[in-house]
Amino acid sequence: MVQPQYGVLVHGAGWVAGEHIKAFQKNPHTRIVALSSRRMESVVQRANDFGMTDIGMYTDLEKALQHKGVDIVSICTPQHVHAENVIAAAGAGKHLVIEKPIANSLEEIRAMRDAVRQAGVKTVVSFVLRWNPLFSTLKNLIAQGAFGNIYYVETDYQSNIASWWAGFSEARLKEKGVSAMLVAGCHALDAARWFAGPEQDKAARVTEVFAYCGGWRKGCTREYNYYTGEWADNRPPLEYEGLEVYMLKFENGALGKVSANYDCIMPYTFPIEIFGDRGTVKDNRIWSHLFPGQKGWIEIPTILPTTADVGHHPFQGEIDHFVDCILNNRESHCNLEDAAHTHEIIFAAQQCYATGQPVRLPIL
């Protein structure tokens, strides 16, 4: 039986778009048929980078969506335009790969969710670490009961995000970035949900949030570049706090703590701790009842989430999973509906900052 091949439009021509293009080019069921972005020179450059000549090139999403043969749209634009992009693509009947964060407000998420539900299209959101080999291994072990019932999860996103990142000029702004947890810390929040869930392909839901924000970088024009090890003055400052710490109560009774820390003076790290009543995880080290007489930590020799470089992130696994979902008419465990809950937690924390009180979910 001949399997279908899906045409792909990649909307956005930045750093992460290149990783989407690579993944679609390697999947046997997809081919890039069009690229679009705000500037034509960026579109042309991306096409040249990946040897694509016979494709449509656009600066207008509406026109790009009309390009013949587009079945899937990858949204790789800045976060503050994701909502309008997703609504337009869903309205055109296209399946969607959506970069995180998906939106900048609960209102935008509701509108996106309504558009996707009405269109009946498939979606996946790029909480791409779910396909990291360590994450996959730990999730399998959790589902097998290697650590018993999970009662506490702790995850942290620690990255000195600053002007070395091309997206910082917009993401640092309160209006366009909103918060450290939304821009990038959401990876750690999604990880906490993923590991707190005992089922193989399901993340746990949160029922209550309490949060603090602080740190030192908000409004500060002095910044550190951990790639060069140098300090610089007169840099554009963050308009929101660089540190956020969440306390979470999960629906299944587990507790969690998640932080996003842009203010750290060190290389990128992504610490993971998972505690069960029959075992424990500390990053890639495990202690489990499966190993009677265990005298020391067992280290899993696999790829860890050790860099913010998107070239290190497992986009191929995400794209292959999503194409398989389309082929077999099933929903992704990381679809828009699921990812909306991760974002809902972030906006609940924003409410907590305003009131100083825990916030009960749902609020979406």
Which ranges hold each PLM region?
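Contiguous beta-strand/loop segments that form the cofactor/metal-binding neighborhood of enzyme cores
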Residues: 2, 190-289, 316-330
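C-terminal helix-rich "cap/oligomerization" subdomain common to oxidoreductases
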Residues: 1-2, 30, 41, 72-74, ...
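Rossmann-fold dehydrogenase core element
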Residues: 111-128, 148-155
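N-terminal Rossmann-like dinucleotide-binding module
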Residues: 1-51
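Predominantly a Rossmann-like dinucleotide-binding segment in NAD(P)-dependent oxidoreductases
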Residues: 129-237, 356
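Hydrophobic residues in well-ordered beta-strands that form the structural core
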Residues: 98, 104, 123-125, 154, ...
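Beta-loop-alpha module in the N-terminal Rossmann-like domain of NAD(P)-dependent dehydrogenases
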Residues: 55-115
